[in-house]
Amino acid sequence: MDKELQQYYEERFTMFTTKGWKDLVEDIEKIKDSIKVEDIQDEKTLFARRGELRIMNWLINLKDVSEQAHQDLKKEDTV
């Protein structure tokens, strides 16, 4: 793994340890839990909610996905 990519992951992992990141994920989880499918009135709103949920899931899972990608890259370096 080159230095630039290593720094990218180190900075990302530092971000994940901050109170701000933890608060953001907690807020996103609350918003996600409050979305009710039965309140969706039309197809346009359904697709909008679907997009919102995808973004929320991406952010909620970003830490785990980043850690896995970093581990995979480290394994490639040792092979």
At which residue positions do the language-model features occur?
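Compositionally biased amphipathic helical and low-complexity segments enriched in hydrophobic
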Residues: 6, 25, 47, 60-63, ...
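Small/flexible residues
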Residues: 14, 51-52, 76
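Short, charge-rich amphipathic interface segments used for partner binding and complex assembly
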Residues: 30-69
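N-terminal acidic leader/helix
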Residues: 1-30
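Short acidic DE-rich linear segments
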Residues: 3, 71-79
